[in-house]
Amino acid sequence: MFSNKKKVILVISISSLIFFLIFNQVKSQELRVIDGDTINLDGEKIRFTGIDTPELKQTCIKEGVKDPCGVTAKKILIEKIANNKVECINEGKDQYKRILAECFVNDKSLSSYLVRSGYAFAYRKYSKKFIKDEDYARLNKIGMWSMNFEYPWDFRRNN
């Protein structure tokens, strides 16, 4: 039915496929979103660099109605990373011993995404990297830019 040459090729092909499937499995990640700019990835607490999101207990006002903008920032991040592998570039540690990093999903910056969504701010005190993303959200009145809000750093200082 099959020549010896075809049998050998078939065995090699099947063996190669099995090898590929076994050794190219993506390592599963243990990932938990803490708030809009902090995650726990494989047991490490990671704070996104260059951005600041509203605190979880922080609210904004839109047309006289309170919006839980801190919770919304967290939800946006959860939705963006759901069922995706998160990769981070470590940039050091902060005073709270958190890893400072820029993190990505499908090679796209989560920080840039959050700022352009209007639920994170370019943290100019530490980086100028996301200013253009913030300008885009502000000019288009996206997210918090369509509301009355307090900057997260002011909220923390006042509360």
State where each predicted segment sits.
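Small beta-barrel nucleic-acid-binding modules, primarily SNase/OB-fold domains
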Residues: 1-159
